[in-house]
């Protein structure tokens, strides 16, 4: 009976101990701070154009739709996607498509450095983004990249020509 009581006390102690929020700063043996994965992903830096080329991948975010991106017999389709694919080919990199729920999610991903380009016609109102590449003058909308990524914005502006639309459509 005494053993059962001791066992129960130990189990309860372990249970309560495991439920406490452990916010201690952890350090490596050589003194650097260990940042939890969730915090380090928040501080991801924007990849420069050179980083994108050396990594061999451009990450585009967009919404699912007939003009943006859709899957047709295991092939990507949609005007925004096809244009971005053309840009990725010009850079000599592959294109990864990340479909987002809404424009807010796309903007967050680009600001956090989780994506390189918003291949979607965004209103040019957010000052933390750089608007570049394919745009529609009548609606004052354009693709966007992180404001810090000037080289990518310039490359997109140098690449896009309105005549491309006729070739893709």
Q: How should each PLM-predicted stretch be described?
A:
Residues 90, 99-116:
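Short helices/loops that flank or line small-molecule/ion binding pockets
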Residues 70, 106-108, 127-129:
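Extracytoplasmic/secreted cell-surface and envelope-processing proteins
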Residues 32, 66, 114-117, 134-136:
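Intrinsically disordered, low-complexity regions
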Residues 112, 125-146:
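Ligand-binding "clamshell"
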Residues 2-98, 130, 147-154, 158-169:
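N-terminal hydrophobic or amphipathic helices and topogenic motifs
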Residues 63-66, 102-103, 113-115, 122-125, ...:
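Solvent-exposed coil/turn segments that connect beta secondary-structure elements
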Residues 58, 93-94, 111-120:
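Alpha-to-beta junction loops
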